[in-house]
UniProtKB/Swiss-Prot annotation:
Cellular component GO terms, alphabetical: cytoplasm
EC number(s) from the headed UniProt entry: 2.7.1.33
Sequence similarity: Belongs to the prokaryotic pantothenate kinase family.
Superkingdom of this protein's organism: Bacteria
Single GO BP term: coenzyme A biosynthetic process
NCBIfam families: panK_bact
Cellular location(s): Cytoplasm
Pathway as given in its UniProt record: Cofactor biosynthesis; coenzyme A biosynthesis; CoA from (R)-pantothenate: step 1/5
GO molecular function: ATP binding; pantothenate kinase activity
Protein name: Pantothenate kinase
Residues bound to ATP: 94-101
Length: 315
């Protein structure tokens, strides 16, 4: 990570045991059945992980959102009129295979249990990837997941509309089976209390842009940002494990874009996944994703077996 002196200046550093103490009797509202539904492929997250890591985090976020709501009341009093309600936007960034989606789903399930903000929506940025035909036209198919492969204008228009209090905003849905947007399906967002936005590049700013530093970025609309972190050696091994599991699930689907991978043996599948990581996911991590890590308000650090072993919280 960053050097120790800079890290100490920017972050409060908690090991797992110290962080777990900050739960402060927040009740566990998820069952093992709930967790089975929420966890992703190749995730071994347990209820103890929820208790030790996610309950303290949900408590922190509840306090922060409450403070924002109080600030809104102060602003209304100062202006002499009620401003439109604006959702609190939480972004979750990190590498492919780090478990961002599982983190986002668990946080959504926990945050909606608090009576102060029961409506919590989750949107992934996958739906804002350019359609396959457009990626092929632009020569970006091998750069899918890199910043330039996203329809950034559509993404910014969406976040801006939600943040402005729009009554109804539609979001493109993405299918990992067909490896493309679903042309006739949309997710509808209707004035949530909290919006969780999960994706590879949601911490990016103009300093990182290969396109145009003058345009707004998703990070400009985010109130609290989380980065899920792990060593690249672990990330690559998790990606390969997930790829092997997909052979008998997603890849085996007759509509799968990657159906040709379903017949690979273990050696072939491992070699293929390793090549994909080395050619696409690894470079994207090092060039675009990891450099944004220290902009996050909170870093969740994973060790072996996907277990969080460290939490860094911005001072």
């Amino acid at each position: 990570m960053i050097n120790n002196q800079t890290q100490e200046a920017l972050y409060l550093d908690f090991d797992r045991a110290r962080w777990a103490e900050l739960r402060n009797s927040v009740p566990l509202t998820l069952s093992e059945a709930d967790l089975t539904r929420l966890r992703g492929i190749n995730e071994r997250i347990s209820l103890s992980e929820v208790t030790d890591i996610y309950l303290p985090l949900s408590r922190l976020l509840n306090l922060i959102v409450g403070a924002r709501q109080q600030r809104g009341l102060v602003l209304n009093q100062f202006l002499g009129n009620k401003q439109p309600d604006s959702p609190y936007v939480i972004s979750i960034a990190g590498s492919v295979a780090v478990g961002k989606s599982t983190t986002a789903r668990i946080l959504q399930a926990l945050l909606k249990q608090w009576p102060e903000h029961p409506k919590v929506d989750l949107v992934t940025t996958d739906g804002f990837l350019y359609p396959l035909t457009e990626l092929k036209r632009k020569g970006l198919l091998q750069r899918k997941g890199f910043p330039e492969s996203y329809d950034t204008k559509m993404l910014i228009d969406f976040v801006s509309a939600v943040k402005s209090g729009a009554e109804r905003v539609e979001v493109p849905l993405y299918s990992h089976i067909i490896y493309d947007r679903l042309p006739y399906e949309r997710q509808v967002i209707q004035k949530p209390d909290i919006l969780i936005l999960e994706g590879l590049n949601v911490l990016q700013t103009g300093l990182d842009s290969p396109v145009d530093i003058r345009r707004p970025f998703v990070s400009d609309f985010v109130d609290f940002s989380i980065y899920v972190d792990a060593d690249e050696s672990l990330l690559k091994s998790w990606y390969i494990e997930r790829f092997l599991q997909f052979r008998s699930s997603a890849f085996a689907d007759e509509n799968s874009y990657f159906r040709h991978y379903a017949s690979l043996n273990d050696t072939q599948a491992t070699e293929t996944a390793s090549q994909i990581w080395d050619g696409i996911n690894g470079p994207n991590l090092r060039m675009n994703i990891q450099p944004t890590r220290e902009r996050a308000h909170l870093i969740l650090r994973k060790g072996a077996d996907h277990l969080m072993n460290r939490v860094l919280l911005r001072k």
